Design a protein with these regions (language model features):
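N-terminal amphipathic alpha-helix/helix-capping segment at the start of soluble metabolic enzymes
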Residues: 43-70
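Catalytic PLP-binding core of fold-type I/II PLP enzymes
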Residues: 66, 129-143
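Conserved, mostly hydrophobic/aromatic
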Residues: 66, 92, 96, 161, ...
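Catalytic domains of carbohydrate-active enzymes, especially glycoside hydrolases
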Residues: 88-103
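The catalytic core of metal-dependent phosphodiesterases that act on cyclic dinucleotides
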Residues: 222-223, 234
Length: 308
């Protein structure tokens, strides 16, 4: 391990002065444990278990975003219908999406989440349509509510839970009981005096520890670009994305048309400039070892995954 790695471990020990020394000792031991897991995992290709079958991540994969909401720049309608959802899903599948991530409650910064009943109403429409049309598709549900996750897996056989909250409420125990892969997102306040990647690694390792103790076997980590992070912090995180390999788990990046690109450019998220910035960011993320890119625009991003 290089000098930067050791320096960052030392810095991370000051994240909370009130935390007992033994906590940091445990943290360091976990970092070393994950480092050795990483070394051993290099002997075989990374994969996740989807309903008893290994889904390889040896080559990067494309996760298509399907927003069953009425306030998304990528997909907006006043009355969400199966036909509208299917049109988006069909386009993504035809363009080469490896998995479909369906969300029915906007989680973009500044948005007001709909209540649980409305989220489930929208999600049922989307899942019924997509599962019927594409029974073999790998489906992910984007939700921070454990109850929604349980119903999605039980009623529609959803394959993956994508949770931007970092595991609030009963999410961790629910995912453990459901036995499905879980996407863990960094979503916590940042300390301006510490390197971004150090804070993200510290947070994710603690959460992964908790998930593993509960019996969750397949975890994908998402550094959470834009969540509780400034534009500068998100860009720093992208530059240092390879640091996250110390955790030894597949990395998903959600960079698609994020404000970290369109705000500095002074353009709208729907603009061509925002799209091109997304493509270049995804290209960089893959070069730094990302296993999954989560995107609105499949066709233009798919070619990035043919070569690492």
């Amino acid at each position: 391990m290089n000098q930067f790695f050791f320096e960052n471990i030392q810095k991370s020990a000051f994240l909370s002065k009130k935390t007992h020394f033994l906590h940091y000792l445990s943290q360091i031991l976990w970092i070393f444990q994950y480092f050795f897991v990483l070394l051993s995992s290099q002997m075989s290709a990374p994969a996740i278990n989807i309903k008893g079958k290994l889904f390889s991540l040896a080559q990067p994969r494309v996760m298509a975003i399907i927003n069953a909401t009425n306030d998304s720049f990528a997909f907006s309608c006043s009355n969400i219908s199966e036909a509208e959802i299917l049109a988006v899903a069909a386009k993504a599948v035809n363009e080469g999406a490896d998995m479909l991530d369906i969300g029915a409650c906007s989680t973009r910064p500044g948005s007001t989440p709909v209540d649980e009943a409305e989220e489930w109403r929208r999600l049922q429409i989307a899942l019924r349509a997509v599962r019927s049309a594409y029974p073999d598709a790998i489906l992910s549900v984007d939700t921070f509510r454990a109850s929604i996750a349980r119903r999605a897996v039980t009623d529609f056989g959803v394959d993956i839970i994508n949770d931007i909250s970092g595991g609030i409420g009963e999410m961790f125990t629910s995912v453990a009981q459901l036995g499905v892969p879980y996407i863990l997102t960094h979503n916590a306040p940042m300390n301006d005096s510490l390197p971004v990647s150090v804070q993200v690694i510290d947070y994710l390792i603690r959460k992964v520890d908790e998930l593993h103790r509960l019996g969750v076997k397949d975890v994908i980590i998402d550094p959470g670009f834009g969540f509780n992070k400034s534009v500068e912090q998100s860009l720093e995180l992208l530059d240092n994305l390879s640091d996250l390999h110390v955790i030894g788990l597949p990395i998903l990046v959600g960079l698609s048309r994020k404000s970290m690109f369109y705000k500095p450019l002074g353009v709208e998220p729907t603009s061509e400039e925002a799209l091109q910035a997304t493509v270049e960011a995804n290209r960089k993320a893959i070069a730094l070892g990302a296993s999954i890119i989560r995107v609105h625009d499949v066709a233009i991003n798919k070619p990035l995954t043919t070569k690492r």
